[in-house]
């Protein structure tokens, strides 16, 4: 009786491992829409922060340029981590 339980447990573990590897392959595929969304959203957040900071300090578009570049870098970093 114990050997039957042991075989059952081993079969369940084997099924779980095969299920886990099949799901990881699905998650490795990167959706192009997700890439575009990450890049555009990072840039837009940088633009928004830059515009608001320029209005707050009443300055030329210095902060707009700085935060736009930072937003683009953040978008590329998010894509790279995926």
UniProtKB/Swiss-Prot annotation:
Keywords: Cell membrane, Membrane, Transmembrane, Transmembrane helix. InterPro entries: ATPase_put (IPR032820). It is found in: Cell membrane. It holds the Pfam family ATPase_gene1. It comes from the Bacteria. Coiled coil: none annotated. It is a multi-pass membrane protein. The chain crosses the membrane at residues 32-52, 59-79. One of its GO terms (cellular component) is plasma membrane. This is Uncharacterized protein RP024. It comes from Rickettsia prowazekii (strain Madrid E).
């Amino acid at each position: 009786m114990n050997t039957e339980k042991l075989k059952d447990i081993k079969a369940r573990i084997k099924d779980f491992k095969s299920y886990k590897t099949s799901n990881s392959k699905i998650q490795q595929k990167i959706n192009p829409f997700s890439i575009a969304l990450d890049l555009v959203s990072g840039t837009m957040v940088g633009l928004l922060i830059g515009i608001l900071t320029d209005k707050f300090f009443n300055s030329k578009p210095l902060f707009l340029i700085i935060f736009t570049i930072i937003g683009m870098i953040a978008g590329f970093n998010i894509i790279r981590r995926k």
